[in-house]
């Protein structure tokens, strides 16, 4: 369904990444990833949980995570493993969360999209509106915020702080990653393949 998502018209190349500030790269990646999600909602009526990492050489991956069956703490560590393996300097993460008060029956689906590096983040939220068939009919923007404390906010902490992996974790995460690679989208943002 989402085999070859197309991004917006902005292309970040390795050359302008070297000259770009971290903040501008985050803003560009956030805008691009948000537009990608808007396109998925309009075209498919669905919003997958996903992670995209970008290396300083312009290599990018897009990993759809809906089929990943790991406890959320292990999933977070696994995602950090992938970002480290592919030498990502910035990443984008998106997916639907449930927010509100379940006791008061006031729970809403919210699409959260974040772009972050080890020191800064930008994150935005959209309320998900579904049609009678359960497909996404609209996304209502709730707000965008940014900051320099990514370790404090869900979805923005994957590159914050240092993380060590045991030999067993490296082996397990490496095997999971090898198994996932055929379904992961890879692209060179410099247009070289």
What are the roles of these predicted feature ranges?
Residues 2-79:
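N-terminal domain-onset segments
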Residues 104, 111-193:
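Glycine-rich, aromatic-bearing surface loops/beta-hairpins
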Residues 46-51, 86-88, 108-111:
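Short, surface-exposed beta-edge/turn micro-motifs
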Residues 78-104:
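Conserved loop->alpha-helix
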Residues 38-45, 96-114:
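Short, surface-exposed loop and linker segments with low hydrophobicity and enrichment for Pro/Ser/Thr
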Residues 3, 65-87, 131-147:
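A signal for specific C-terminal beta-sheet/loop modules enriched in small/flexible residues
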Residues 53-54, 93, 115:
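Hydrophobic side chains in beta-strands
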């Amino acid at each position: 369904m989402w085999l070859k998502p197309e991004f917006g018209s902005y292309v970040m190349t390795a050359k302008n990444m070297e000259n770009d500030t971290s903040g501008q790269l985050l803003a560009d990646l956030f805008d691009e990833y948000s537009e990608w999600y808007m396109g998925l909602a309009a075209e498919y009526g669905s919003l997958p949980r996903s992670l995209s990492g970008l290396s300083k050489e312009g290599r990018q991956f897009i990993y759809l995570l809906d089929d990943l069956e790991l406890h959320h703490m292990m999933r977070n560590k696994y995602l950090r493993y992938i970002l480290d393996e592919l030498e990502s300097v910035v990443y984008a993460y998106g997916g639907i969360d449930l927010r509100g008060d379940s006791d008061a029956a006031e729970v809403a689906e919210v699409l959260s999209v974040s772009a972050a590096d080890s020191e800064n983040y930008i994150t935005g939220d959209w309320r998900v509106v579904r049609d009678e068939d359960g497909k996404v009919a609209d996304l209502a923007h709730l707000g965008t915020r940014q900051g320099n404390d990514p370790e404090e906010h869900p979805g923005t902490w994957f590159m914050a702080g240092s993380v060590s992996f045991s030999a067993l974790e490296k082996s397990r995460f490496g095997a999971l990653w090898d198994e996932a690679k055929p379904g992961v989208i890879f692209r060179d943002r410099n247009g070289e393949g």
